[in-house]
């Protein structure tokens, strides 16, 4: 079953519409979607190494644009929905303190979240909700997302065939590691 799923992903990744799917997933992941674009970027680069940097560009640009939408969600919808609730429970002042602290380190928070597997959408929405300077947000987003996607694409470009062979020979192990990492990430987010 894993082999069929892998083969299907590889055929999808080398398909004509793969760049469009990558752009859509990258955009959505930055604002509301839970699946990281690496799920498509990695097999796409493995399937077509010569397009590695074009794919990284697509992922970066659409992710940053999606991040701007996430920022807008935080700036315009979060306060309309959450502010009355926070005020009702007496937490509005605590949120304002959180916002001040968040904005003090905002560029670093956005950058770190942008290069790690941490759900980037949480930070894009929080950046808008706390009023982080939009220019600071965008610069940190471009640098972080660009670094993340170009490093992944670059490594796969340089070491493509051996990595593909490694993945194909150890598909079960790779899937197990992925699932454990995914579940561990969700648990860490829930309890940290």
Stretches with model-predicted labels:
Residues 66, 70, 148, 181-185:
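Alpha-helical transmembrane segments of multipass membrane proteins
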Residues 76, 80, 129-136, 190-192:
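Helix-coil boundary and interhelical linker segments in multi-pass alpha-helical membrane proteins
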Residues 64-84:
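Transmembrane alpha-helix/helix-exit interface in multi-pass inner-membrane proteins
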Residues 80-105, 168-192:
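Selective transmembrane alpha-helices of multi-pass membrane proteins
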Residues 78-89, 142-150:
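Juxtamembrane non-transmembrane "cap" segments at the membrane-aqueous interface
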Residues 7-61, 101-166, 182:
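Hydrophobic alpha-helical membrane segments of integral membrane proteins
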Residues 1-2, 153:
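Short, membrane-interfacial amphipathic segments enriched in basic
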């Amino acid at each position: 079953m894993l082999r069929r799923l892998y083969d299907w992903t590889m055929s999808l990744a080398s398909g004509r519409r793969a760049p469009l799917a990558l752009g859509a997933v990258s955009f959505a992941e930055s604002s509301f979607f839970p699946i990281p674009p690496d799920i498509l970027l990695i097999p796409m680069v493995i399937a077509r190494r010569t397009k590695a940097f074009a794919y990284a560009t697509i992922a970066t640009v659409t992710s940053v644009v999606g991040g701007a939408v996430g920022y807008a969600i935080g700036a315009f919808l979060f306060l309309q929905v959450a502010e009355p609730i926070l005020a009702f429970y007496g937490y509005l002042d605590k949120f304002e303190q959180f916002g001040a602290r968040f904005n003090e380190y905002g560029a670093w928070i956005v950058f770190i979240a942008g290069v790690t597997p941490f759900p980037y959408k949480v930070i894009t929405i929080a950046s808008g909700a706390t009023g982080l300077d939009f220019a600071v947000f965008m610069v940190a987003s471009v640098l972080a997302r660009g670094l993340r996607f170009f490093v992944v694409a670059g490594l796969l470009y340089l070491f493509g065939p051996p990595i593909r062979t490694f993945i194909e020979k150890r598909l079960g192990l790779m899937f197990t590691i992925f699932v454990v990492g995914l579940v561990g990430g969700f648990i860490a987010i829930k309890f940290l």
